[in-house]
């Protein structure tokens, strides 16, 4: 293993494109060998992905139209952190309630990942939510159309295996929990 430095030095950062939910950022950077290059990436901030378990052990899932792939997508509740959240745990509670109308007795962080750090700065924080019960109405964003359902955990795991659960965030959450369960929780 070489001791050569790997870090790039950011010389300039500018937003090339901005819209609700993300930005395209262009940076001028100096590589360790002195070469100056430009680098574009998607900047979308931190998000939470929640695996909500009902008292009977079923998983609360959402079905949502995804315009980019032009189909209904079955997924775990997920969304970006908001300034009013206070902390990531609060964001997990909020997203669960907003998207599903369910509330959890407790949330526990499973893991955090950078799903595409070659071209995006996104961080997904995964949570398991226990004791989830329907307590109210959804509070959806203007551009969300979401239907709520429940599914057996084993059915979701099988859907990942067969390719029927195609949402990458959700597939990772289901498989992480299948592999590590509560013992994989980090806080």
State where each predicted segment sits:
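Short helix-loop capping/hinge motifs at secondary-structure junctions, enriched
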Residues: 58, 133-136
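Acidic, metal-coordinating catalytic segment for phosphate/diphosphate chemistry
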Residues: 8-49, 55, 64
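Nudix hydrolase/Nudix homology domain
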Residues: 2-8, 72, 109, 117-125, ...
């Amino acid at each position: 293993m070489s001791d050569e430095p790997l870090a790039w030095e950011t010389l300039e950062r500018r937003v090339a494109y901005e819209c609700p939910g993300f930005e395209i950022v262009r940076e001028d950077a100096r590589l360790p060998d002195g070469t100056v290059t430009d680098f574009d990436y998607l900047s979308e901030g931190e998000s939470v992905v929640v695996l909500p378990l009902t008292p009977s052990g079923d998983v609360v899932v959402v079905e949502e139209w995804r315009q980019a792939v032009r189909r209904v997508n079955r997924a775990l509740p997920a969304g970006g952190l908001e300034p009013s959240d206070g902390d990531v745990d609060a964001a997990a509670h909020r997203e669960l309630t907003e998207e599903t109308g369910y509330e959890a007795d407790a949330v526990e962080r499973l893991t955090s990942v950078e799903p595409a750090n070659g071209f995006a700065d996104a961080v997904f924080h995964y949570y398991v939510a226990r004791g989830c019960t329907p307590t109210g109405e959804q509070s959806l964003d203007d551009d969300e159309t979401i239907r709520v359902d429940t599914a057996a955990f084993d059915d979701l795991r099988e859907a990942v295996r067969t390719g029927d659960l195609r949402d990458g965030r959700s597939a990772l959450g289901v498989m992480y929990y299948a592999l590590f369960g509560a013992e994989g929780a980090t806080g």
